A protein has these predicted regions:
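Extracellular glycan-recognition regions
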Residues: 1-220
Length: 220
């Protein structure tokens, strides 16, 4: 339905210089190994979000390479994130955020949350799904089967692709469709549009990321 148009942002995520302007909320630890950004934790309770500083418009295709290194844990992408009154996500008038999930789903921001690697708890590892939630609130709006292997069976980075155009969200892994959703703009509040994107992990997860790109979404 949509393809990549003009490139709005590109980041290799391979050196400290690549993320010097990114913002960490919570107890995340950054390292760079094998040409990738590795995210891990400072302690078992150190969940965190690493935010890209750019604010993106609506109508985008987000792609990135992902590789799970150690589980249990969880990996998530926040997108269309902004203050609940339309403020920039980093506005000084918003409440301070420290990585606790409640601050993101029931605080003073709106966002969409794509959990694409859910292996924190035994029940998540026993029946693996990718979940899409909308906030403010903890609204589960779509689910799909998770095709990603556990770290011991992973043999290459996996190409993640998220399409967000107005009320439409589509997510795929290595071109395999995983979930799709249309927001009616009523059930869970108005449709979310532009905003920031961020990488979230729940400890003790360790994962690698590289080659993040954001393109304008163009109808095929």
């Amino acid at each position: 339905m949509y393809k990549e148009g003009v490139c709005l942002y590109r980041n290799p995520l391979r050196t400290p210089e690549d993320v010097k302007d990114w913002r960490m909320e919570g107890g995340g630890r950054l390292s760079f190994e094998n040409g990738s950004l590795n995210l891990s934790h400072e302690d078992d309770g150190a969940h965190f979000v690493l935010w890209c500083p750019e604010t993106f418009p609506d109508g985008i295709v987000v792609t990135w390479n992902f590789y799970p290194i150690e589980q249990p844990g969880l990996c998530m992408l926040f997108f269309a994130a902004a203050g609940d009154k339309g403020e920039d996500l980093f506005d000084s008038g918003l409440n301070k955020r420290t990585g606790s999930y409640q601050e993101y789903h029931s605080g003073d921001i709106n966002a969409l949350h794509l959990s694409y690697f859910r292996r924190k708890y035994a029940e998540e590892r026993a029946f693996r799904t990718c979940n899409l939630r909308k906030s403010r609130g903890f609204h589960l709006v779509a689910m799909g089967a998770d095709p990603l292997p556990s770290p011991e069976d992973a043999d290459s980075p996996y190409r993640m692709k998220l399409i967000k155009v107005k009320d439409y969200v589509h997510f795929s892994i290595n071109d395999l469709p995983v979930l799709e959703w249309r927001d009616d703009g009523k059930t869970y509040g108005p449709v979310l549009h532009g905003g920031k994107i961020g990488l979230r992990q729940m400890a003790p997860m360790k994962a690698a990321y590289h080659d993040l790109s954001v393109h304008q979404a163009v109808r095929r």
